[in-house]
Amino acid sequence: MDWTSEHLSWLVKNGSILYSVDRKPIEVFEFRYTKDDSIMSAWARHFRNHYCLDSDIDVLRHGTFLSRAEYLNKIKFPDQSKAPGPSIRAGDFGEVLVADYLQYCLGYWVPRTRYVNKTVRNESTKGSDIIGFH
């Protein structure tokens, strides 16, 4: 998968500056959703590929008798409603956003292997959350 930043058009600097305890400036971003199917598809593709590359899904689901959507929802993604799935989903989403910020806004290279190698879908992956190289 070629990682792109096209999905980030909804993430916009709002012009506010906050300051940390040690007086360092912090830019504030807002998630500004607009009804745009192409951007929504870009978000879906971007997050989906963290768990299972589009180029790999058919090989991985072979023999399961599951559709692509069923494979992702039953095997790869954290559960949508059964605990701790929702909190794991939220944490994963936040980590992906921070990784995207580091990579696409600050110019770091951020490896994207954390979720594709998950062995238990409803658990956080052990180890460092995010690492970026400049």
Annotate each language-model stretch with its function:
Residues 1-126, 131-134:
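Mixed-charge (Asp/Glu-Lys/Arg
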